[in-house]
């Protein structure tokens, strides 16, 4: 790997008015409010078959790479200590743009832009992001991140989960901190309706953005 990596420059994030007045957007490296305000810049790969997804569990960062070049970087939420995201080199096993949780509790809850890895029970998908490990093992991504990662990958794309990556102290450190925990739960009727998938395709969810 080259010693000098091409760093992504994140544009300033525009302030987004959400349900709570405390949700604010600041410069990268600081608090950015909720994940619905985050839209990562992306570089198109020159060789899509060389794309890899790298996940840092300690930094809660996801990087889409091609060789030593970072094409996309984003904060994510990974598995908590009792249900960690499986470490190792995996591959995307399946992709489902519109998917719902099938097990209880939470059956019917949308898990949009689903990309399974390790096993059918683990995936990268849209979900509420918090600044600490909080999932049952999946990797939750901001909505706009999830769409871009979904479009950049294919079944068979490597997913490499490690405690840290070479980019955590550079690109990763410049990313904002995202926290969806202040947001209320959307109505159950909305989350289980077809409108949630129609909104997903427009890059929005309920009235969060």
Regions found by a protein language model. Give the residues of each.
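Bacterial N-terminal signal peptides that target proteins for export
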Residues: 1-10
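Exported/periplasmic cell-wall-interacting domains
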Residues: 23, 28-29, 84-87, 96-209
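N-terminal post-signal-peptidase region of extra-cytosolic proteins
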Residues: 37-51, 57, 72-80, 93-108, ...
């Amino acid at each position: 790997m080259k010693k000098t990596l091409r760093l992504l420059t994140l544009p300033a994030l525009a302030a987004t008015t959400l349900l709570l007045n405390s949700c604010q957007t600041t410069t990268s490296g600081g608090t950015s409010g909720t994940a619905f305000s985050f839209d990562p810049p992306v570089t198109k790969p020159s060789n899509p078959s060389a794309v890899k997804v790298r996940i840092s569990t300690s930094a809660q960062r996801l990087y889409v790479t091609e060789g030593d070049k970072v094409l996309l970087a984003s904060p994510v939420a990974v598995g908590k200590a009792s249900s960690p995201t499986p470490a190792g080199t995996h591959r995307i096993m399946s992709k489902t743009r519109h998917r719902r949780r099938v097990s209880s509790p939470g059956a019917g809850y949308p898990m949009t832009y689903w990309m399974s890895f390790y096993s059918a029970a683990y995936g990268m998908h849209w979900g509420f992001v918090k600044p600490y490990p909080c999932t049952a093992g999946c990797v939750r991504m901001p909505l706009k991140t999830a769409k871009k990662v979904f479009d950049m990958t294919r079944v068979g794309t490597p997913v490499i989960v490690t405690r840290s990556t070479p980019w955590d102290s550079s690109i990763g450190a410049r990313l904002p901190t995202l926290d969806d925990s202040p947001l209320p739960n959307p109505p159950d009727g909305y989350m289980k309706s077809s409108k949630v998938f129609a909104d997903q395709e427009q890059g929005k969810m309920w009235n969060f953005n």
